[in-house]
């Protein structure tokens, strides 16, 4: 597989959320607003990139019987570092994300790429695979955060977009359903349906 394909495929035919249906829980939990969705996206991307790189570098020295334990130790260490950076520089977002940053440790995307790719590939392709899957995940999270905050709260990144456009004065009201977790699940379902309708080879 070419290096470019490692970044390109997770955006379309091998998207971790739309095709593999991994990492859906965070889609429901952190996408009510755009800012936490972006921060979570960056956090997961950094963790999956670095964990892929580290495990790939160590792949020939890890005993098969304890590989999952080693992977969890590496991912846990990276997640703790990311969490501390967020608390130091983005404390408000860190509080908003709460336990969900810690739950990156159990994110199926991270563990899936370590098992399926990093354990059998060289460091550079593993790093690119982590980047591609992180970005593929990020596109969906940021899209959901954009739509849900705009139509649910009338804001984007806290800026009152709908108010500035004067839509409230003509009777527009925020859709409270948009900021509820079930709506995120519905939106993910709609995106998956649209994606598979455009890619017939993905249909079972």
Per-segment meaning from a language model:
Residues 24-28, 44-49, 76-83, 105-109, ...:
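Hydrophobic core segments of alpha-helical transmembrane domains in multi-pass membrane transport
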Residues 62-75, 96-102, 129:
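Cytoplasmic-side transmembrane-helix entry/capping segments in multi-pass membrane proteins
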Residues 51-64, 111-121, 194-196:
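C-terminal ends of transmembrane helices
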Residues 7-18:
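N-terminal membrane topogenic signal
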Residues 157-177:
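Short, membrane-exposed interhelical loops at transmembrane-helix boundaries
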């Amino acid at each position: 597989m070419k290096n470019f394909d490692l970044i390109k495929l997770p955006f379309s035919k091998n998207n971790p959320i739309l095709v593999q249906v991994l990492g859906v829980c965070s889609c429901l939990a952190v996408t009510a607003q755009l800012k936490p969705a972006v921060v979570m996206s960056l956090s997961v991307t950094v963790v999956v990139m670095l964990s892929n790189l580290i495990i790939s570098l160590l792949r020939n020295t890890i005993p098969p019987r304890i590989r999952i334990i080693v992977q969890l130790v590496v991912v846990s260490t990276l997640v703790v570092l990311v969490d501390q950076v967020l608390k130091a520089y983005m404390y408000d977002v860190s509080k908003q994300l709460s336990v969900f940053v810690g739950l990156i440790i159990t994110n199926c995307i991270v563990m899936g790429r370590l098992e399926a790719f990093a354990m059998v590939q060289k460091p550079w392709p593993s790093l690119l695979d982590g980047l591609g899957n992180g970005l593929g995940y990020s596109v969906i999270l940021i899209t959901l955060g954009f739509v849900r905050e705009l139509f649910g709260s009338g804001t984007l990144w806290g800026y009152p977009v709908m108010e500035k456009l004067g839509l409230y004065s003509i009777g527009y009201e925020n859709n409270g359903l948009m900021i509820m977790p079930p709506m995120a699940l519905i939106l993910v379902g709609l995106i998956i349906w649209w994606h598979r309708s455009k890619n017939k080879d993905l249909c079972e």
